A protein has these predicted regions:
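Alpha-helical membrane insertion/targeting regions
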Residues: 1-183
Length: 183
């Protein structure tokens, strides 16, 4: 009986560590994805963009940091702190809806201005579906995770899926910047 309880506890700990490792992996993917198009140009003083771009980055990276923190709290057995801070996740997720919608709308309007290279508006609109599609999935999975908050196994899986759905844009940037043919 005691051995079975120990094995169950060990499996639960491995599961908690898995979700923390996955959260860190998502954060690393996001950072690496935006390294060539945002972080490096910012560090070199070459990035030019309106405040909305910085707000967008701040809010979405806030989610990634929040998700890492939440999974770390659970992995350390600090469930009460996890639940207390959980309300902040709803605020960040709500902000994400507005900021992603605003940045996608802004990018499309900028690409559609007269004098832009031919085909740019089409490319930006096509890429917008990556952001909007990821956001739509995030909203659905996040809402279901809130509904399933009393079922930890379902709750954590839905939040991981929601977070993974946000990785389309940073992963696409690997292809757009690192693997794109030379101009």
């Amino acid at each position: 009986m005691a051995e079975a309880a120990l094995q169950t506890g060990a499996r639960a700990n491995v599961s908690r560590q898995f979700y923390f490792a996955m959260a860190l992996t998502c954060l690393v993917i996001a950072v690496l994805g935006f390294m060539p198009t945002y972080f490096m140009p910012m560090a070199q003083g070459k990035f030019r963009g309106p405040p909305l771009v910085h707000i967008h980055g701040l809010v979405l990276f806030a989610w990634m940091a929040f998700f890492c923190t939440q999974t770390w709290l659970v992995a350390r057995g600090k469930t009460l702190a996890h639940r207390t801070w959980g309300v902040l996740g709803v605020s960040i997720a709500t902000a994400m809806v507005f900021v992603v919608t605003a940045i996608v709308s802004w990018r499309i309007s900028q690409a559609s201005l007269p004098g832009q290279p031919e085909g740019l508006a089409h490319g930006v609109r096509a890429f917008a579906w990556v952001s909007i599609g990821g956001l739509a999935f995030f909203i659905g999975a996040f809402a279901l995770a809130i509904v399933e908050v009393r079922r930890p196994e379902t709750h954590k899986r839905l939040l991981l899926l929601a977070t993974i759905s946000l990785l389309g844009a940073p992963i696409a940037r690997w292809f757009l910047t690192l693997l794109a043919p030379s101009a």
